[in-house]
């Protein structure tokens, strides 16, 4: 039940904190000894029951706050829980490393994939690979021992710098990929990156430099990380929190959503523009007449025009399919990115305003769930691109089957097969007239 303070008003503060932060020392609404009985004042009081919480079955909240700032919440796991959690975290780490290594190897060693637009995918894979190698193992160890940081003060700052830079680089690369896809679809002839491979490395370098701009301030005194013997937490300074979350997430997410909207709009416009109503059918009466030869000549000319129209429409259909595929791919990328990272950044933005700048008062399991959901984005990125890219799929399959020598040949054969499929549609004039009596008669005579 919700408590009532001395003035008769509902005790909203105590009610909310009893739900969000159980077992934590909370202020109590109680009149101070010399104060007016009608005025409530803050009198800190530690809640009872901490020993009971610490003695609960594993996994359980430790319930002790081991430093002055109130940081250091820990979870005591039993042996079975540690085995299950450790196995899951190890599997996530290994799959992330394997998937992103496949991307890097595929683009670097397969000639057909060495295109400027694929450099962005390599940059994304390197960022995600860095997360899996330099960040996730230390988070895994910290989580397995209940949330206590054991790697020291100096390495805490190094770890936070690596975590922020790699995750931000991954997010910003996804943003640049969305811009690249949009320009490639809407400006295929004028988009310079497609023709000039020198521009793409500059864009990638800009992404990593901007990511470093978020990493460096805590190292040079603008905002100090929360760092003691048991806690390693990024700075909770209000200004730095707003700056870092905006640059690392909210602005890139807004750009990605806008690019997806523009590609989706272009695909719908292309679908409406290139609808093919069908060819006009030639009536038999127009062929079988007294002036049959003249009529036939006119119909042959009309069929030739329709054949050219068919070629043009086939090209339009190819453009439409490419736009539709780009819209679908980018939509799934944006959706997965938002689902993975939005909870973490909402929590990171709100945390200083809820808990203050000294430490985090959010339950440890909530923070870790949101954090691992964000790390999962580094796992699924290479599989998303492989699912929508036939060349990457073929290369993955060949690498996993240790068939290294025939990769380029297989990609060339697959590309030729796709081109032949597009050219399979009939173009002969008499095929347009196949419903006419003349064509049926000609086929019967032959």
Curated annotation (Swiss-Prot):
Lipid-modified residues, S-palmitoyl cysteine kind: 402
Q: Which residues lie on this side of the membrane: Extracellular?
A: 1-84, 142-153, 221-238, 354-364
Q: Which UniProt keywords apply?
A: Cell membrane, Disulfide bond, G-protein coupled receptor, Glycoprotein, Lipoprotein, Membrane, Palmitate, Receptor, Transducer, Transmembrane, Transmembrane helix
Q: Name the residues that bind serotonin.
A: 163
Q: Which residues are glycosylated?
A: 5, 67
User: What is its subcellular localisation?
Assistant: Cell membrane
Membrane-protein topology? Multi-pass membrane protein
Q: Which residues form a coiled coil?
A: none
TM helices/strands, residue ranges: 85-109, 120-141, 154-179, 200-220, 239-261, 328-353, 365-388
| Gene Ontology MF annotations | G protein-coupled serotonin receptor activity
Gene Ontology annotations of biological process type: adenylate cyclase-activating adrenergic receptor signaling pathway; adenylate cyclase-activating serotonin receptor signaling pathway; chemical synaptic transmission; circadian rhythm; positive regulation of MAPK cascade; smooth muscle contraction; vasoconstriction
Which cellular component terms (GO) are annotated to the entry? plasma membrane; synapse
**Cystine pairings recorded for this chain:** 156-232
Quote the Pfam families the UniProt record gives: 7tm_1
**The family this protein is said to belong to:** Belongs to the G-protein coupled receptor 1 family.
The job of this chain, per UniProt, is described as: G-protein coupled receptor for 5-hydroxytryptamine (serotonin), a biogenic hormone that functions as a neurotransmitter, a hormone and a mitogen. Ligand binding causes a conformation change that triggers signaling via guanine nucleotide-binding proteins (G proteins) and modulates the activity of downstream effectors. HTR7 is coupled to G(s) G alpha proteins and mediates activation of adenylate cyclase activity.
Name this polypeptide is given: 5-hydroxytryptamine receptor 7
Q: Give the gene that encodes this protein.
A: HTR7
